[in-house]
Amino acid sequence: MPNNIILASKSKVRKDILEKNNIACDVKPSNVDEDMVKESLLNEKASPEIISKNLAELKANKVSSNNHEKIVLGADSVIDLDGELISKPQHRKEALLILKKLNGKEHHLISSVCISKNGSMIWNYTDKAKLKMKNFTEQELEKYLTKISDNALYAYNVYQIEGEGRKL
């Protein structure tokens, strides 16, 4: 029997959160070109909160427009480090560079969620958390990346605070 809820994301973490809360859902990634949207919004001087909200809404609405009568959940998170938006790393070297940038510094994790039905948003929420990463040597950061392997490539903050990264 198909679910009435669709997660517009390929994020394993987001799916796990829903499952841990006994929320059954189907997964249908939106395939929104996040980099293009982000670049356009940055050119318009949009805040990190607006960027996160718009991406969550765009993802949910896109999947919702092709799945009428279903409730679609879209989400997005961005990292703001002193006005610089940190993007997902494309490879391990880039993940290490991001960790070095965040090392010992305060930064903000901005997360948004949007619920859409029939291609239109019916609810959204955005929140901001202040985080501070401890100081680590480059060797410690390398060791951490080895431990979490390719999982570092699936999160904006690289260190995935919901898992092993909470130790950072």
List each language-model region with its residue ranges.
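Residue-level signal for short segments within beta-strands and strand-turn junctions
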Residues: P29, L81, I115-K117
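Acidic/polar active-site rim loop that often engages polyanionic ligands
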Residues: V37-L41, D80, S120-D127
